[in-house]
């Protein structure tokens, strides 16, 4: 009571927020005569003037009123469309990083031109995000008339563009595209090997159309670029069968401290003999060599019932510190498969994620984010919690006069559909257009069959063909039209009423079920009553509908029985309407919790992703990587030193042979640790000796190659190593997330465990990147002095770009270097010809 009284006196918080923007709207309107007097050329030249003022210290907010007035005048001259005050308010909200709820037909597309133009003046780019290629192309081509008139460029990002076309589109002042393409381009850029081929600029400002669909409905499904993890699991089994022939200290050496094993020359020869391979170090056999090394490691360093157990025909890791089973965790780099082969259980063959990101985390990377939709208010709490976005309901240009009738509830679905069909026929005979909303395609087809039998002409909207969809929806307001569609279909296209339809009551919306979300129901209703047009809506429900059956069907059935409702008779009752709304609120709350939990888990991966991608971008763009390499050499030198250091012993008493072997393995160099050297040396001096010896070896290689070729080689090796280990890490993190909830940890939060173990795994990843990068760099042999040929991209898998089941886009990428010719570049990355390097 008190709250209602205060709202009547002071207005709602939304009304107050709108009122605060009114002075800006008044200023824009006051500027209109000034811009009307300018010639076309003078209007266009104003853009350069605005940019100059920005460069001289003014802000976008300082320019807002003039910029909006300019765009309004340009829109009128080019499209004969003038922004209403409601669109100005919407534009201001979008510029301020707020979600603007604008009802259907209120001109969201035109409203977006205002903040898009203003923010494009900074030169940092504006992305306007839509739900499909058709809308992206339509809106870009339509609105580009305004932008081009004002000397701004427009790009379009749609499916099937090549790298050069994408780069050009992103270089534009304003870029239209789909949420999927913007997200995939972010991932693609972080898999590139050449800085010149990077497409996206920084993520500056995004205006997301149908923001509720993209940031809420699609938030639970990540964008994934994947490729096959292995060609086949047979190689694991094949290498496992020959391991018994290998003898310790003859065919391989084991370093238990470093938990590593290495093949000797005799071991390599035996492997070649048993596997029927001429040269295990031939580039085409590197994969076989890797499998052989992992098989030896599995048999010699990992013990059953100590390091792992076999449970339900699966190899499960045992935590070495707690002794607990680490369900869901897998060893990386094929080691887990080698253990599976050793134990004779099924060897996992997985489609490996190469890169992934959720929409939640992708769009939070923009410096400024805003969005628009016809229905956002019911999800305002989620937008605030997840994205820190406020929602502003924009007043309609004309009052809403649509009549929303109470729901009709029947006992059975059969009765419900009979009544709905009868209503459709009745309205069709009257000439009033009807849009029938369903929650599933099969329901649409069932209603279509029933109407065909009654001889009622109608159109079924197929959401798979966006262009056809838009045309069908646009015609849904014609006299006598009957259109059947799923509730979500046809968004982005206004339904314009045909001649004489207003007099018949406008477009009638007939919903055949309530959706789990009130927002989706409101979207369906919102198709009618645009810009003050008449219209009506009603939902037909039954006690057999999922929502009612699962949430409170028994209670509603009892009410209907008490009221003595006969078969075929509907009920309209406020109590039942409230029960349905309560059911929807429960489901919405449940789905919100799922999405919140998803982002809590994905935030762990996102922090790691940002570190790796930032490091990768630095490697790609820095002109000099020598400092980075020297830092890695220093780190690894002192880590090796720490492995063998014993504060209670003089260095002469350390395991110097083991230390020498580890230095050899990491840096491919012999270090003099003879008694003459070590006798008068302390622990720190020995660490410095390892570091300086490795740095000197690095400088010698740099001198031999020359600085330019060294840079190219370093960049290639490091990018390839980062990508290879990162994809393994993604797989391991997936397994961790899947299995973390199955652990038997009493009273422990799975999320906390995931964060802790994920961090430990990430630390291990960073160390492995250093180790492998330096190991490869120091092992590359320079056969003779000749100019390095341009280093090519590494071999790529067949990539799969996936978001949801119906939008998988397979892009086969041709494998390179399946067979290496004598005059081809050596696959090891040295930049030399194969015949002068590994094939010598």
Swiss-Prot record:
Catalysed reaction, written as an equation: ATP + H2O + cellular proteinSide 1 = ADP + phosphate + cellular proteinSide 2
GO biological process per UniProt: intracellular protein transmembrane transport; protein import; protein targeting; protein transport by the Sec complex
Keyword Protein transport recorded: yes
Textual note on the cofactor: May bind 1 zinc ion per subunit.
Record CDD domains: DEXDc_SecA, SF2_C_secA
EC number, UniProt record: 7.4.2.8
Region (Disordered): 518-537
GO MF annotation list: ATP binding; metal ion binding; protein-exporting ATPase activity
Record-linked InterPro entries: Helicase_ATP-bd, Helicase_C-like, P-loop_NTPase, SEC_C_motif, SecA, SecA_CS, SecA_DEAD, SecA_motor_DEAD
Keyword hit for Amino-acid biosynthesis: no
PROSITE patterns referenced in this protein's UniProt entry, alphabetically: SECA, SECA_MOTOR_DEAD
Function (record text): Part of the Sec protein translocase complex. Interacts with the SecYEG preprotein conducting channel. Has a central role in coupling the hydrolysis of ATP to the transfer of proteins into and across the cell membrane, serving as an ATP-driven molecular motor driving the stepwise translocation of polypeptide chains across the membrane.
Protein's recorded name: Protein translocase subunit SecA
Source organism (scientific name): Desulforapulum autotrophicum (strain ATCC 43914 / DSM 3382 / VKM B-1955 / HRM2)
């Amino acid at each position: 009571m008190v709250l209602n009284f205060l709202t009547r006196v002071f207005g709602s918080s939304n009304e107050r927020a709108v009122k605060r923007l009114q002075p800006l709207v008044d200023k824009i309107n006051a500027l209109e005569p000034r811009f009307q007097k300018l010639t076309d050329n003078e209007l266009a030249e104003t853009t350069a003037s605005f940019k100059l003022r920005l460069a001289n210290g003014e802000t976008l907010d300082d320019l807002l009123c003039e910029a909006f007035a300019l765009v309004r005048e340009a829109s009128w001259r080019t499209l004969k469309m003038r922004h209403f005050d409601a669109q100005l308010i919407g534009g201001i909200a979008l510029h301020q990083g707020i979600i603007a709820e604008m009802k259907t037909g209120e001109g969201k597309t035109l409203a977006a031109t205002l903040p898009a133009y203003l923010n494009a003046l900074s030169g940092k780019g504006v992305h306007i995000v839509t739900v499909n290629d058709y809308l992206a192309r339509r809106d870009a081509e339509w609105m580009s008339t305004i932008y081009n008139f004002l000397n701004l460029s427009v790009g379009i990002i749609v499916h099937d563009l090549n790298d050069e076309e994408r780069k050009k589109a992103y270089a534009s002042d304003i870029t239209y595209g789909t949420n999927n393409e913007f997200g995939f381009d972010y991932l693609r850029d972080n898999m590139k090997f050449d800085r010149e081929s990077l497409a996206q600029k920084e993520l500056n400002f995004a205006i997301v159309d149908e923001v509720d669909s993209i940031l809420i409905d699609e938030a639970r499904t990540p964008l994934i670029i994947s490729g096959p993890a292995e060609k086949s699991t047979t190689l694991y089994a094949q290498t496992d069968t020959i391991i018994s022939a290998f003898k310790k200290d003859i065919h391989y050496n084991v370093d238990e401290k470093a938990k590593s094993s290495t093949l000797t020359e005799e071991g390599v020869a035996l492997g070649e003999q048993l596997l029927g391979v001429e040269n295990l170090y031939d580039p085409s056999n590197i994969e076989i060599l890797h499998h052989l090394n992992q098989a030896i490691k599995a048999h010699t360093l990992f013990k059953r019932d100590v390091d792992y157990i076999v449970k339900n025909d699966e190899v499960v890791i045992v935590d070495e510190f707690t002794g607990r089973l680490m369900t869901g965790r897998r060893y990386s780099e094929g080691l887990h498969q080698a253990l599976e082969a050793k134990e004779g259980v099924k060897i996992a063959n997985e489609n490996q994620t190469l890169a992934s990101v959720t929409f939640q985390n992708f769009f939070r990377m923009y410096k400024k984010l805003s969005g628009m939709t016809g229905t956002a208010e019911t999800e305002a709490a989620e937008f605030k919690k997840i994205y820190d976005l406020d929602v502003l309901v924009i007043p309609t240009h004309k009052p809403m006069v649509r009549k929303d009738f109470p729901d009709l509830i029947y006992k059975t679905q059969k009765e419900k559909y009979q009544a709905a069909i009868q209503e459709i026929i009745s309205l069709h005979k009257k000439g009033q257009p009807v849009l029938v909303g369903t929650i599933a395609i099969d329901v649409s087809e069932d209603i279509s069959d029933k109407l065909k039998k009654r001889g009622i002409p109608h159109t079924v909207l197929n959401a798979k063909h966006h262009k056809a969809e838009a045309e069908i929806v646009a015609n849904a307001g014609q006299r006598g039209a009957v259109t059947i569609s799923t509730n979500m279909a046809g968004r982005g296209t206004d339904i314009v009423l045909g001649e004489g339809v207003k007099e018949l009551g406008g477009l009638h919306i007939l919903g055949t079920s309530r959706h789990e979300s009130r927002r989706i129901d409101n979207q369906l209703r919102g198709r009618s009553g645009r810009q003050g047009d008449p219209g009506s809506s009603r939902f037909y429900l039954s006690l057999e509908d999922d929502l009612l059956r699962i949430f409170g069907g028994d209670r509603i059935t009892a009410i209907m029985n008490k009221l003595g409702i006969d078969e075929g008779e509907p009920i309209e009752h406020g109590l039942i309407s409230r029960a349905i709304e309560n059911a929807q609120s429960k489901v919405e709350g449940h789905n919100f919790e799922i999405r919140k939990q998803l982002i809590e888990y994905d935030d762990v991966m996102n922090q790691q992703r940002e570190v790796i991608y930032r490091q990768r971008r630095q490697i790609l763009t820095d002109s000099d990587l020598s400092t980075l390499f020297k830092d890695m050499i220093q780190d690894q030198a002192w880590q090796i030193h720490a492995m063998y250091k014993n504060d209670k012993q003089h260095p002469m008493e350390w395991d110097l042979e083991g230390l020498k072997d580890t230095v050899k393995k990491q840096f491919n160099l012999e270090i003099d640790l003879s008694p003459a050297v070590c006798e008068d040396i302390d622990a720190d001096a020995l660490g410095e000796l390892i570091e300086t010896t490795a740095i000197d070896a690095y400088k010698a290689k740099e001198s031999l190659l020359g600085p330019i070729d060294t840079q190219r080689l370093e960049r290639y090796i490091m990018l390839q190593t980062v990508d290879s280990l990162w994809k393994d890490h993604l797989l391991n993190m997936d397994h961790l997330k899947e299995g973390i909830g199955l652990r038997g940890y009493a009273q422990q939060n799975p999320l906390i465990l995931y964060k802790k173990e994920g961090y430990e795994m990430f630390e291990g990843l960073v160390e492995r990147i250093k180790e492998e990068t330096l190991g490869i760099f120091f092992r590359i042999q320079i056969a003779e002095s000749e100019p390095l040929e341009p280093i090519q991209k590494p071999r790529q898998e067949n990539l799969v770009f996936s978001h949801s089941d119906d939008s998988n886009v397979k892009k086969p990428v041709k494998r390179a270097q399946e067979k290496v010719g004598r005059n081809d570049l050596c696959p090891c990355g040295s930049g030399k010809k194969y015949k002068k390097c590994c094939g010598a």
